[in-house]
Amino acid sequence: MIDPKFIGKTYPPTKYIVGIEKIKEYVNATGEKNPLCCNEAAAKAGPYGQIVAPPMFAVVYMKETVGAMLFDRELQLNMPMLVHGEQEFLFHKPVKHGDEVFTTGRLKSAEARKQNLVVSLETESRVNGELVTTGLYTFVVRGGAL
């Protein structure tokens, strides 16, 4: 079980510079078909004037912040017993090639559900101070409430 004093703990900003090659790799790996994400001519003619990252690219620029929480020694999470529960995102603005994305995190909750520990992390990602994506990650530590 996580000591309740850690609920609300914050994780400092991590920086991710969005590269066109990383967007292309993500598009190819996921089979993204949105022309604003994978067709340069369509993207240039579109509302953003260039290729934008697919919304779920958020997992790429948020991963270091999520990792900081998962591997936080103070929380003493039992990693071999941890599984991904779910994730939710709110997309506020598109992320584009060249953007410097800064993501922060906050341990939202840690609660016992039967014998398991359910841990939630909230994230906020910003470009030039403007919120682009918020996320909620939920993890389950099997047997972690015992």
Over which residues does each language-model region extend?
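Hot-dog-fold acyl-thioester-processing enzymes
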Residues: 1-84
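HotDog/MaoC-like acyl-thioester-processing domains
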Residues: 1-2, 90-146
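Low-complexity, intrinsically disordered segments exposed to solvent
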Residues: 84, 88-90
